[in-house]
Amino acid sequence: MKLDIKGILLLAAIAVALAFFWLAPSDGLQAAPKAKMTTIDGEPIDLTELRGKPYMVVFWATDCPGCVKEIPHLRSLYNDLGKQGFRIIAVAMPHDEIPLIKTMREEKAMNYDIVFDEDGTLAKAFGGVKVTPTSFLISPEGKIALQKMGELDMDQVTQMLRDML
């Protein structure tokens, strides 16, 4: 049987186009999960109450080199924009341990909210996060404006935030 390459390519292109339109949210941006969590200091956070200002949720781990490399940049971003209402929530993955998380917070002067996702509920709520760092920038309207697996482009994030604030 002879393969018709043009036919296969056409079918593949149609399948990709259909999958894109079927999976894409209707307004182009997916709503952020309506999750509740508690910081490692016992402060409750309800993401639905953060509407009106942008915030970032960063899934990280103490044993993740890329995550540790991002900490000074996140700290600087929070220092620059926190007074305008911007918030960072760093979510430590289930394999981490509270003592290690607290030690890193002190050593790296992490001045933003830190949550321990002990049972993986938050990772599931954000689409099954398994890789760190994975970051979500949420718009003031509660939509996911940026989702990034791997280290962030801080210039891009800063510009997006300045446009939102």
What function would you assign to each model-found segment?
Residues M1-T38:
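N-terminal targeting signals for export/organelle localization
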Residues P33-R51:
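Short extracytoplasmic/periplasmic juxtamembrane "stem" segments immediately C-terminal to an N-terminal membrane anchor
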Residues R51-K53, K83, N111:
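Active-site acidic short loop of glycosyltransferases
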